[in-house]
């Protein structure tokens, strides 16, 4: 695809805060190569470290930023704003302001389908996602198809339809994606450099603008995280084997989320992670009591929970910042669950998802991983994937009894993932470049950014779902038109 052919050609693009590391700097190079004029605002020395040239340094207060933003958009005649995380204080007003001014907004976020994807959506992500708003229409399309009763997902995460081999849906990118590999240490390296630079430059910038503390203490918490990782590896030796052996199919896995993640603070009704832990324990204790009372009616497909336990898994990125051991012990005693609760840290998550009886979470993207491994999932908050046929739709109080009969439908899950990838995901990582891709940012773009920011009104087919409908009205995967020049490394389609 030539530069002139790119929808970004002639566009004026504003980059606000991006992920830690050089991703936004490299993306700016790709945008310029496509013919766009790029403007960048830095808010702290960490931003400056990875994007030092041709930028605007903002060092005022949050209120001053709110006053400056509309002036900046007007002064530079901005056509599109790109940012990472739509709930950060400096980004929170961008969506409404841009909508009023007719400016496109593209939001990056960690991938819904990790580790091989990052998220890029117009308008917003998670609870602000357009995909989330259009799920009702998608569900109508699935109802028109009829629920595939013969197919379900077994505990190995494979389709169990007679004679049917599991495969990615036609027209999706699932079968064509490139594996990213483990990029934990890449992200950790960029993160440490970012926070150290931000702390070192605190005299020259207003670090209070950042959504997390940028102090020397925060750096110490990251050092504490590495120390705790080694400590828990020693103290929790043997836990993985116990869960995969003695307790296999007898434990419910509860993945905890980062304490100040917007998924908790903005997109859930829980005041804190501790509030969620309390809710889960109270419900499970009630289920144990309910089973022992004959007058209490149990669900139709109820199975005993008397031999089951709860396993709370700490989020690895929150290891140095929070420790819920004391709260877990207190709540365990309060709800009479002694001997039925484990609090763990760094076990191999995919193996746990395969071995557990079910998964309970607020709205973490771990839920999609769990579904992929065939685990029944109960969502206690608001999540994109919390739809009938994929997750358990009943009450948490009943999930404990009905988990084994709440396996996700394989065909439904495949259709959903195909739509999710096509509409919201980009193959790659913010922290580690995919080898061999044509874009300096290291993510496989293939024209998808422009398509999502400025969707064409053309009619597109929905493979395996329904006849043709308007592109803006369908969540079904777009029909593949074969590899473009960008796919082969000859172009720069964004």
Model-derived features: positions:
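Active-site donor-nucleotide binding/catalytic segment of nucleotide-sugar enzymes
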Residues: 16-20, 245-277, 281-282, 288-298, ...
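Active-site and donor-binding regions of nucleotide-sugar-utilizing enzymes
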Residues: 20-26, 43-137, 159, 367
